[in-house]
């Protein structure tokens, strides 16, 4: 069956800022009782289990959710390509053409290694950093992510709250392993 995740990716935090902003959001999540303050092995690594206020983040709370061994929130810092779907669609913002994902992995790897990850549209030849392309389902390129393992779908208002708290653009990236 596998595990699913959703990552709220901060698109604007620098590597140097990621731990600071991660702490701000974690403190808020704990204060709102959305996650438990104690870290445990609940997120395929160290994370925070859902707290009694987790319904502020999700639209529902199925019975199975709280009983899962893997159901925590993990903070990921450092330059990361967050993706969960191999069958993605790349859409050019300039002309709207759907492009093959063939160049996506190379551009993502270039970005991960510190480059811009430039990618040119196969139709209009407009070149742009991979971070600015429209990718569906979304991918996230950033230095900070809040990864929620096996949580029911996160509320749009919750994602917006995180964006406001950070003062940055975010993208919600769904995936599974």
Residue locations for each model-derived region?
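N-terminal alpha-helical interaction blocks
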Residues: 1-86
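Long, contiguous alpha-helical scaffold regions
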Residues: 147-177
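Cys/His-rich microdomains that often coordinate metals
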Residues: 98-101, 127-130
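Short linker/helix segments within small regulatory modules
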Residues: 105-120, 136
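Short glycine-rich, basic-tinged beta-strand/loop micro-motifs
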Residues: 2-5, 137-152
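Short cysteine-rich clusters marking metal-coordination/redox-active sites
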Residues: 92-95, 121-124
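Residues immediately within or flanking Cys/His clusters that coordinate Zn2+
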Residues: 87-89, 118-121
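Short secondary-structure junctions
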Residues: 26-40, 104, 165-175
């Amino acid at each position: 069956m596998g595990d699913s995740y959703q990552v709220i990716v901060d698109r604007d935090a620098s590597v140097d800022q990621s731990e600071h902003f991660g702490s701000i959001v974690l403190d808020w999540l704990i204060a709102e009782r959305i996650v438990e303050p104690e870290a445990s092995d609940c997120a395929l690594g160290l994370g925070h289990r859902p707290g009694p206020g987790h319904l502020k983040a999700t639209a529902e709370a199925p019975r199975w959710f709280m009983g899962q061994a893997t159901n925590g929130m993990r903070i990921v810092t450092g330059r990361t390509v967050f993706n969960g779907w191999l069958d993605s669609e790349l859409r050019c913002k300039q002309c709207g053409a759907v492009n093959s994902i063939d160049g996506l992995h190379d551009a993502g790897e270039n970005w991960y290694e510190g480059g811009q990850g430039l990618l040119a549209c196969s139709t209009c030849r407009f070149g742009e950093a991979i971070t600015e392309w429209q990718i569906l389902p979304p991918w996230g390129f950033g230095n900070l992510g809040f990864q929620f393992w096996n949580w029911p779908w996160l509320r749009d208002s919750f994602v917006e709250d995180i964006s406001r708290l950070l003062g940055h653009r975010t993208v919600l990236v769904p995936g599974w392993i």
